[in-house]
Design a protein with these regions (language model features):
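Phosphate-backbone binding interfaces of nucleic-acid-interacting proteins
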Residues: 1-202, 206, 339, 358, ...
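Beta-rich nucleic-acid/ligand-interaction surfaces
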Residues: 39-43, 200-202, 455, 491-492, ...
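Glycine/proline-enriched, intrinsically flexible loops and inter-domain linkers
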Residues: 5, 23, 53-55, 189, ...
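Extended, well-folded interaction surfaces typified by the phenylalanyl-tRNA synthetase beta subunit core
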Residues: 413-579, 718, 770-774, 782-803
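A carboxyl-terminal module marker
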Residues: 2, 20, 27, 439-442, ...
Length: 803
């Protein structure tokens, strides 16, 4: 939120610099994201008085002699402007000066005549008419006659000011205004707060009755309105235009500016209805009817439903409550009577409507954080005072104040100094705490038993209990007073990673060593992602938890698989020209026992890996899994299984110690054909995906992997070419070979052959075996005995013959 330094000074007698105030605001919990000097980029620009003028023959230029006081009384400058006269004072950029945008002015010849600077327009100084009158005139900016030559230009045109861009946290909606920040400035400086004038006088009776009603008090706890007749549209005074301009708003007309000024100054959104356009002279705050439509002031049409709160006349909606008025009730040059409204709307209602319709405004931004029930009273009074001050309408006696029935009263918190200090962990003198709370407009009534009855200001709806009082005390007292200490009962532990974190880090390093990069995706997606993978309706992955108020339908459910997100990442890479890569993600998936959920879902840690590129194949992923298994001292078994999104002939399930960990394989052809990538990419790409239950994987790990010395004896190698049926998997053969003897230290498949000489439904698989014994050399007799046993087991269990 932007707050001008000069505007704050109207509320508080500030005796510190803007930079010092920035530090003080930060110390009491308000981050100034940027302190913006209005004269940023301007240097050596002063007031110059034109003392001589002469038209430069044959050109459009005028040669001027300018009096710049101490900088020189006869500085010769040529200009192309024509709106000045002898004796005028104008902004003068001297030789070596700078202007906004990084422009540097140097002495140079113009049409053969030496010019020692530049005479400036308002635009060249970054000004507009709202900041300084005459700034948008074509030509030079003419300064007041009493300007003193040689004076720095900034204070003359109002550029000696700063804008505080302050980040307002969600728990402090009362600070969404200049007044709100001024309250904090007054407290931190120990200065009195000068409230803006809010008195007004009704000068006439209404000319016709108006009906105002609230049908949804749960969404509109307070609705105030006041009728003003004989509206006189005109221009706003200079001070109001400047206030608006410093906050980034342009002046429109006196009445419109009053509503915007009240929003900025008091933090109270306002709207004014042209009663000549309000059917039946009726205002009704209610839920929208299904299918109702409204066109807002920015000429956008929306279709509404009962979740949207609207303000209606006798026939139709005329405003989206808390967001924006309707084009059918806005002010124009023919407006003669207005109903000014100030209200408190439920923040959730405004937020949901704003998100659902995609419609935001300065008003909705404030309502979403919260506007207290006291605010409409102050805002409306201030607006009516300004109407009277600017004489832009006649205030009638007709006013409305409709509430939900709750009394408007201060919150009372009973606390003791010991409780407050107990929260802070330090001792703050009682009187110091009382002084701080009183500066923040709390009242403190000290009871006979030593307790305090503290009442919070009406605008501080965030204050609930004594810890909130402790926060108020410490942010004014100073966080630097808190001394770090250990609790008496606390134990000191060394920092570092716990066991689970170490195992996760090890997993990531093992995969990184295989050329995989870590991906990080959102925990939400939509049913479209599950549809993309052809997940059947009865699959457990379809039992996804739906978000009550999703940011968008694309992020409407909590993920039950990581694979959809991984495939999206791969597709994004392909679209952007990255033709190959290896990725992994380790993150939780959210599994509900039943829907709708009545207990916290299981957040299962899951590992997903993906590889894509023309050279990638099934063994890329299998090799990464083998490296992972070896890193944890495990052995993976593989069985022929598939999933809805995998190619049925190029996929497998991973098992360890009899536990099913997950599946991996090539992306199914039909899914690959549906991907939104170029056809040539679909034809040349190989996409492989795998998803493992990481918790099940870690349950197979038995403590730390211990070093096993290599056998000092050379292993004996044997190759076996085996003929088997097409249905027999490599994993089944490997498992049978390994179980035949402890001397088998390594089994590797190195060839697969299919041919007519083998017979129908047959294939040949060639394996390389390593046999070793850590205690001695393996004899030829032992090798023959082991090989014989292996062949016997293969024939008995799998019907396999030696080729």
């Amino acid at each position: 939120m932007k707050v001008p330094f000069s505007w704050l000074k109207e509320f508080v007698d500030i005796d510190v610099t803007a930079q010092e105030l920035e530090e003080k605001l930060f110390s009491c919990g308000f981050e100034v994201e940027e302190l913006i000097p209005l004269d940023a980029g301007i240097s050596k620009v002063v007031v110059g008085k034109i003392v001589e003028m002469e038209k430069q023959e044959g050109t459009h230029l005028t040669k001027c002699v300018v009096d710049c006081g101490a900088y020189g009384h006869e500085i010769r400058i040529s200009t192309g402007a024509a709106n000045m006269k002898l004796g005028d004072c104008v902004p003068t950029a001297l030789d070596g000066s700078t202007l906004p945008g990084g422009i540097t002015i140097k002495a140079r010849k113009m049409q053969g005549v030496e010019s020692n600077g530049m005479l400036c327009s308002g635009a060249e100084l970054g000004l507009n008419d709202d900041l300084f009158p005459g700034s948008e005139v074509y030509g030079l900016l003419i300064l007041p006659e009493d300007s003193v030559p040689g004076t720095d230009i900034a204070p003359v045109v109002g550029l000696d000011d700063y804008i505080f861009d302050i980040s307002i946290t969600a728990n402090r909606p009362d600070c969404q205004s200049v007044l709100g920040i001024a309250r904090e400035v007054a407290a931190v400086l120990g200065k009195p707060l000068h409230m803006p004038a809010m008195d007004y006088k009704a000068v006439c009776e209404p000319d016709a009755p108006i009906t105002v009603k609230v049908e949804a008090p749960e969404l509109c706890p307070r609705y105030m309105a006041h009728y003003v007749r004989n509206i006189r549209m005109g221009e706003s005074p200079r001070w109001m235009k400047r206030h608006l301009a410093l906050c980034g708003l342009r002046s429109i007309s006196n009445v419109v500016d009053i509503t915007n000024h009240t929003l900025l100054e008091m933090g109270q959104p306002m709207h004014a209805f042209d009663l000549n356009k309000v059917a039946g002279r009726t205002i009704d705050v209610r839920r929208a009817h299904e299918g109702e439509k409204i066109v807002t002031l920015d000429e956008k049409e929306f279709t509404l439903n009962p979740n949207n709160l609207v303000i209606c006349d006798a026939e139709k909606p005329v405003a989206l409550a808390g967001i924006m008025g309707g084009a059918n009730s806005g002010m124009d040059d023919n407006t003669t009577s207005l109903l000014f409204e100030c209200a408190t709307f439920a923040r959730d209602s405004v937020r949901k409507t704003s998100r659902a319709l995609g419609q935001n405004s300065d008003s909705s931004a404030r309502y979403e954080k919260g506007v207290d029930r006291y605010s409409p009273q102050l805002g409306l009074a201030r607006a009516l005072h300004l109407i009277q001050q600017l004489d832009c309408g006649d205030i009638t006696t007709l006013e409305y104040d409709l509430t939900d029935g709750r009394p408007l009263e201060r919150k009372h918190i009973v606390a003791t100094p010991a409780k407050i200090c107990g929260v802070l962990g330090i001792t703050v003198p009682d009187q110091t705490m009382i002084d701080i709370l009183q500066r923040l407009e709390f009242t403190v009534d000290v009871q006979a038993d030593g307790s305090w009855d503290v009442s919070a200001p009406l605008y501080r709806e965030d204050v609930e209990s004594f810890p909130d009082l402790a926060e108020e005390v410490i942010r004014e007292y100073g966080y630097d007073h808190i001394v770090p200490t250990f609790l008496n009962t606390a134990s000191v532990t060394n920092g570092g990673l716990n066991y689970d974190q170490k195992q996760q880090l090890k997993t990531k390093r093992l995969l990184a060593a295989q050329g995989f990069y870590e991906a990080s995706t959102l925990a939400f997606y939509s049913n479209a992602e599950l549809d993309m993978l052809h997940i059947p309706a009865e699959d457990e992955a379809r039992k996804a938890i739906r978000i009550l108020n999703p940011i968008s339908e694309n992020l409407s459910i909590m993920r039950t698989l990581l694979t959809p997100s991984m495939l999206n990442v791969i597709v994004d890479n392909l679209k952007k020209g990255n033709a190959e890569g290896r990725l992994f993600e380790m993150a939780p998936v959210y599994l509900a026992k039943e829907l709708p959920i009545n207990e916290h879902p299981h957040e299962r840690q899951t590992l997903c890996i993906g590889a894509f590129g023309p050279e990638e194949d099934f063994f890329t992923v299998k090799g990464a899994l083998e490296a992972l298994a070896a890193g944890f001292g495990l052995t993976f078994d593989y069985q022929r299984e598939t999933a809805a999104w995998l190619h049925p002939g190029i996929s497998a399930a991973v098992y360890c110690n009899g536990k099913r960990l997950g599946v991996f394989g090539k992306l199914a052809n039909e899914i690959n054909a549906e991907l939104e990538i170029a056809k040539e990419q679909k034809d040349s790409q190989n996409i492989y995906l795998g998803e493992l239950d990481y918790e099940a994987l870690m349950s197979c790990v038995e403590g730390e992997l211990r070093y096993k010395p290599l056998s000092p004896y050379a292993p004996v190698k044997r190759d076996l070419a085996l003929v088997c049926g097409e249905a027999v998997s490599c994993g089944e053969i490997e498992e049978t070979i390994r179980k035949a003897s402890p001397l088998v230290s390594e089994v590797k498949l190195f060839d697969i052959y299919r041919g007519a000489n083998l017979g129908d439904g047959k294939k040949s698989m060639a394996f390389s075996l390593s046999l070793s014994d850590p205690k001695k050399e393996v004899s030829a007799e032992e090798v023959e005995r082991v090989v014989k046993k292996i062949l016997g087991n293969l024939k008995f269990k799998l019907g396999i013959e030696i080729r």
